[in-house]
Amino acid sequence: QHHEEDMDLMLEMGVNAMRLAHYQQDEYMYQLTDQSGILVWAEIPFVGPGGYADKGFIDLPALKENGRQQLVELIRQNFNHPSIVCWGLFNELKEEGDNPIPYIRELNQLAHQEDTTRPTTSASNQGGSLNFLTDLIAWNRYDGWYGSTPKTLADFLDSTHRKHPELRLGISEYGAGASIYHQQDTLKQPAPAGYWHPENWQTYYHIENWKIIHERPFVWGSFVWNMFDFGAAHRREGDRPGINDKGLVTFDRKVRKDAFYFYQANWNTTQPVLHLAGAQNRNSDY
């Protein structure tokens, strides 16, 4: 029932692809994507340190064998799902510490041994040799949220494409936090780690970032982070602890944020969309 509710909301918004991060998903979700014609990036849980004080990869035989097993199981269990278009090998790894590059090469070869028909991909958040190992590469970018402005996304994409035109590059994550209870009349960039996560900044962020992505046909795909607010135990930001509020829909699936309707207007070609942004701002003078 929960998977069906999530799928209905995504179809309502008009998505045509999803990244099922960062781990194997329930079989029923793959059945729903098959039925709905949504393209899927499926991946194993080989994840860098993120917000935790760790290095992500530890060069131990047990860890590497576990990764091999999970990749083989992911591919063999889901090989016949037509919605799956690529296999993801890692998310936000670092070359510092134990260098994961030889192991990623091994996983890439293993994926092609198991499936000769689908490309491999990965989600990076830095430069270096990590970005030249899989068939496709995508970056997690938060230009205009974790500092900088949306314009830096344009600079990054253009510069990377100019230097490495051979790279098949995409955007694996982009997003900004928002609380439906935080409303402001002015457009002011908030502090990501702070309490105040105004909804209108998230809307602005997505309008500007999507414009940049849409204008660059060399970007093979892009994935909003995230469709729904979700639990994240280490986070102490926004209006609730333990929640990542970058979703376009609230955690309980009850409220579609303004940015949801922006994408619906751009992506859903089957129905017209009229939505008044900022309607939840009860303190406005207009």
Where are the regions a protein language model picked out?
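Extended substrate-binding grooves/exosites of carbohydrate-active enzymes
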Residues: 1-286
